Amino acid sequence: MEPYVVDNLNRDDCVMIVWSGEVQDDVMCDLKAAVSTHVKKLHFENLENFTNSSTISSQFHGCSSVILCGWPNPININTLERGLLSNLSSCLQPGGRLICRESTMEDWNSFRKNLTLSGYVNPYQLPGGNHLIFIAFVPSNYTRGSSIKLPWAHSDIEAAWENVDNETSYDVDKNLINTNSLLQKSDYVTPLAACGQEFAKNSIGKRKRACKNCTCGLAEIEATEVEDKSVVSISSCGNCYLGDAFRCSTCPYRGLPPFKPGDRILIPDDVLKADL
């Protein structure tokens, strides 16, 4: 194995070597001796297990931090299709890496596109003479749904409340408003309506009485109200109190609701006028 490939291995790595073709036993022993001294755990799998069945990828799901593919024999370029690359990525831990050696030199840009579509990130090429040797990574945990606090996202809520406390602590009485001083004595006095005007229905005030020398017409209104109070409704036929169903055609109370004898009845002026 190339020395610069071994330099990319760490003591804590769990390495899976995916081999292909016919390999002699002594070659596999030499490869095992060259790699096992630099890593924590090492095991071998045949490439045909990943191409013919997907159960092998589920069996070794996330068990390796590094996959070496193409040793001792370089892998055929036509074998590294997108499906095989996806199966190998499922066997890698988050942040794991795939180190692969191909038998021929292919266009690196087109092959890097296949790596990206298969779920790998940050692929780059290593010097390999007549072979294409590259390293590709699978996304880390933080890119798979976990959250991280942004370094520039600072919360100023506590600082804002601290500033408010500092501004109000030196003189509390000066910054607070006395609610008893909002209303004056004049605000509690019941207002009087202007001469000739009435309060609203929901008002508790009393209407002002007419002046001695009233010129606004309030005196005439009060005199009319006194005359109206003295008028008592009288029915000559005795049916006027019962309603329109019992009244005569010439009854002056037609159109008014039923009433009791002695009630004060005001007939509007427009009732006595002709319609035409």
UniProtKB/Swiss-Prot annotation:
Motif (Cx2C motif 1): 237-240
Keyword flag 4Fe-4S: yes
Region of interest (Linker), residue spans: 152-189
Region (Fe-S binding site B) residue spans: 237-251
Localization in the cell: Cytoplasm; Mitochondrion intermembrane space
Top-level taxon: Eukaryota
Positions annotated to bind [4Fe-4S] cluster: 237, 240, 248, 251
GO CC annotation, single: mitochondrial intermembrane space
Residue numbers covered by motif Cx2C motif 2: 248-251
Pfam families, alphabetized: CIAPIN1
GO molecular function: 2 iron, 2 sulfur cluster binding; 4 iron, 4 sulfur cluster binding; electron transfer activity; metal ion binding
Keyword annotations: 2Fe-2S, 4Fe-4S, Cytoplasm, Iron, Iron-sulfur, Metal-binding, Mitochondrion
Region (N-terminal SAM-like domain): 1-152
Cofactor(s) named in the record: [2Fe-2S] cluster; [4Fe-4S] cluster
Main location: cytoplasm
Binding residues annotated for [2Fe-2S] cluster, in chain numbering: 195, 211, 214, 216
Family membership noted in the UniProt record: Belongs to the anamorsin family.
UniProt-listed PANTHER family: ANAMORSIN
Job description of the protein: Component of the cytosolic iron-sulfur (Fe-S) protein assembly (CIA) machinery. Required for the maturation of extramitochondrial Fe-S proteins. Part of an electron transfer chain functioning in an early step of cytosolic Fe-S biogenesis, facilitating the de novo assembly of a [4Fe-4S] cluster on the cytosolic Fe-S scaffold complex. Electrons are transferred from NADPH via a FAD- and FMN-containing diflavin oxidoreductase.
UniProt remark on domains: The C-terminal domain binds 2 Fe-S clusters but is otherwise mostly in an intrinsically disordered conformation.
Known partners and oligomeric status: Monomer.
Full protein name: Anamorsin homolog
